[in-house]
Amino acid sequence: MDDQVKMPTGPLKTCPICGKPAVQATHPFCSSRCRDVDLNRWLKGSYVIPGRDDEVDDVE
């Protein structure tokens, strides 16, 4: 068996936060810092998944 690490043959991915090349250890980010920035944005509600504004009926 071949124990060498295989390098990806496709285009290099970039970090969605800063645009630097992503690394495997923190994929798809370039560093733990960018990964934490992204998590913080999700937790603060900065990212929103679009949906419909349905009216909610009050159940009494």
Swiss-Prot record:
Pfam families: YacG. Binds 1 zinc ion. GO terms for biological process: regulation of DNA-templated transcription. Transmembrane segments: none annotated. Keywords: Metal-binding, Zinc. The keyword Secreted does not apply. Zn(2+) binds at C15, C18, C30, C34. GO terms for molecular function: DNA topoisomerase type II (double strand cut, ATP-hydrolyzing) inhibitor activity; zinc ion binding. Gene3D superfamilies: Erythroid Transcription Factor GATA-1, subunit A. Its cofactor is Zn(2+). It comes from the Bacteria. Inhibits all the catalytic activities of DNA gyrase by preventing its interaction with DNA. Acts by binding directly to the C-terminal domain of GyrB, which probably disrupts DNA binding by the gyrase. Interacts with GyrB. PANTHER family: DNA GYRASE INHIBITOR YACG (PTHR36150:SF1). Belongs to the DNA gyrase inhibitor YacG family. This is DNA gyrase inhibitor YacG. The lineage of its organism: Bacteria, Pseudomonadati, Pseudomonadota, Alphaproteobacteria, Hyphomicrobiales.
